[in-house]
């Protein structure tokens, strides 16, 4: 199966769907006032800030550390169960418990992997774990969490955010992209610094779950999101004046390839129908967020 060709076809279909969609809202769609949006944003900011402060107070004493862990998990569970933030009441009891357990485990794993990673970056990566869990339910699978889910989600702060950082020299980004492309292609290439070593370690995690020789399309999908991230750099800089059509194309390819990888990391394979479903799942999320 020509994954790149199929993906580009569905991206074009998504563009056509977007361009031909009505600007009128459905009568039964749930809407939120600006005041309601601001209230929810404040609640989420407070949630992230509380977690950040709690993580910074990591005690050295073993007894106090157990109490610290318990307190953090109780707070996290109560907050995630609040209907006005995450709407977990739509899940059955067993799936909700798995969702909460995965959320707590991911935060623990992220802290263990890189204790210096800002809480905002951890929460950004956490959102992708949630997307992965949602796709598992969509595909009729059980909610689960693996090294591959962890690694791909954690790649966001180390790759996408790195490329988006305007304080990093353009030449450094080019060198990093050259290195990363070779690493994604399976070359045994050395890491030249701490940043690259962390990225390489996460790719190692994916390879441990999905060996390259058996799951080739997992790595084809990773190359697609990589190329989409690089292509999205065209949106940066005052000298780049992209037309609306190009911005739409870049946004759909980047978002679509991101969810495509999530789909492949569920079991290592996807049918053409599942690829189509994933592509349109992204578009519906894209429409809901009003990114454009």
Residues of each region from the PLM?
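Intrinsically disordered, low-structural-confidence terminal and linker regions
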Residues: 1-32
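Conserved small/polar residues in nucleotide/adenosyl-binding loops
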Residues: 281-288
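Inter-helical turn/loop segments and adjacent helix faces that build the functional surface
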Residues: 138-139, 165-169, 209-216, 240-241, ...
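Aspartate-rich (DDxxD/NDxxD/DxxxD) Mg2+/diphosphate-binding motifs
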Residues: 136, 156, 160-185
């Amino acid at each position: 199966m020509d994954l790149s060709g199929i993906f580009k076809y569905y991206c074009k279909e998504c563009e056509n769907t977007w361009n031909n969609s009505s600007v009128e809202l459905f009568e039964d769609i749930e809407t939120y006032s600006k005041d309601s949006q601001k209230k929810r944003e404040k609640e989420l900011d407070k949630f992230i800030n509380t977690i950040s402060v709690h993580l910074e107070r990591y005690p050295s004493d073993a007894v106090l550390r157990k109490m610290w862990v318990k307190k953090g998990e109780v707070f996290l569970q109560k907050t995630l169960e609040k209907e006005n933030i995450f709407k977990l009441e739509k899940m059955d009891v067993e799936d909700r418990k798995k969702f909460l357990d995965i959320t707590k485990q991911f935060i623990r794993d992220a802290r263990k992997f890189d204790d210096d990673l800002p809480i905002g970056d951890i929460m950004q990566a956490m959102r992708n774990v949630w997307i992965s869990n949602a796709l598992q339910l969509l595909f009729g699978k059980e909610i689960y969490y693996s090294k591959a889910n962890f690694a791909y989600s954690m790649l966001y702060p180390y790759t996408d955010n790195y490329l988006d950082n305007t304080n990093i020299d353009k030449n450094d980004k080019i060198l990093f992209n050259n290195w990363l492309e070779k690493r994604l292609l399976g070359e045994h290439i050395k890491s030249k610094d701490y940043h690259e070593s962390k990225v390489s370690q996460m790719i190692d995690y994916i390879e441990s779950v999905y060996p390259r020789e058996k799951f080739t399309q997992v790595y084809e999908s990773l190359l697609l999101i990589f190329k989409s991230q690089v292509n999205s750099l065209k949106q940066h800089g005052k000298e780049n004046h992209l037309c609306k059509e190009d911005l739409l194309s870049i946004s759909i390819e980047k978002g679509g390839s991101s969810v495509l990888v999530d789909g492949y990391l569920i079991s290592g394979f996807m049918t053409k129908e599942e690829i189509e479903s994933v592509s349109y799942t992204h578009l519906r999320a894209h429409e809901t967020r009003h990114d454009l």
